[in-house]
Amino acid sequence: MIDRLPFSRLAMWTCLLGFCGLNWPASAQADEEVFTLYLVRHSEKESASNDPELTPCGVERSVSLRAFFDSVPLEAVYSTDYRRTQGTALPTARSKGLEVQGYDPRSLEVVMEELIEGQQDALVVGHSNTTGVLAGLLVGEDIGAFDESIYNRIYEVVVTKNERRLHVFHTAFRCGER
């Protein structure tokens, strides 16, 4: 037989403490201050030129990313100053009523510091040679670049006062299957 009384008391105290606005110690509150950074590579690009547009598939993937982020709170969207990254970032930024903010992919340590200091839930769109590197810098690991054929990774970095956790998601998106 399951004794339901302890759970009932726990639930009662949780509700009472929550509704009464009990002030927990400041250190406990600070540990709960959380923001999340999402890092993705730009979607499929047209050609090997310096600043190509997205392919039709890349446009579809960018719309799919927007749908993924519909239920995710974002306060900022960042992109490098290339058409392929801007094209990937814009659908999500527009759906959130945000402007795409630029960053320099050649200064990833500076970008990392600014993201941590900004303490905002944010999407950062980069490149195959910068996205994994930036994720690694954010969590203190050597992740490095990844192959140019990979477009389906979403790095999620959860930041609290005392910890930074990295989760890697793989999207199920396939071109032409919207």
Give the residues covered by each predicted segment.
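Active-site-proximal alpha-helix that buttresses catalytic centers in soluble enzyme cores
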Residues: 31-119, 130-133, 137-178
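N-terminal secretory signal peptides that target proteins for export/translocation
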Residues: 1-6
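Short beta-strand segments
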Residues: 125-127
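Noncatalytic modules at the cell exterior or secretory-pathway interfaces
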Residues: 121-123
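Bacterial N-terminal signal peptides
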Residues: 11-22
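Sec/Tat signal peptide C-region and signal peptidase I cleavage site
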Residues: 24-29
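Hydrophobic alpha-helical segments and their boundary regions
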Residues: 7-10, 47
